[in-house]
Amino acid sequence: MRLIKLEQPNCNPCKMVSNYLEQVNIQFETVDVTQEPEVAARFGVMGVPVTILLSDQGEEVNRSVGFKPNELDELLKELR
């Protein structure tokens, strides 16, 4: 499984999610929705940040919207 974070420049909650994931030493991919709007459309993302856990086949398993440490912890449990 893999974790992706959809964000845009100058988004403070996006930075908070990145910092949180980096503190717990989790690898994740970052997608700038202003540069790759097709990714946001694929996952039906209307606002950022959105952190999505994907299966090995690329299917969405779970997601967290905004900076919510409890939701992020749930994603991380599923990732491990």
Curated annotation (Swiss-Prot):
Keyword Transmembrane: no
Disulfide bonds: C11-C14
Thioredoxin domain location: 1-80
SUPFAM superfamilies: Thioredoxin-like
Entries under InterPro entries matching the protein: Thioredoxin-like_sf (IPR036249), Thioredoxin_domain (IPR013766)
Domain of life: Bacteria
Keywords: Disulfide bond, Redox-active center
Similarity comment: family membership: Belongs to the thioredoxin family.
Protein name according to UniProt: SPbeta prophage-derived thioredoxin-like protein YosR
Organism: Bacillus subtilis (strain 168)
Lineage of producing organism: Bacteria, Bacillati, Bacillota, Bacilli, Bacillales
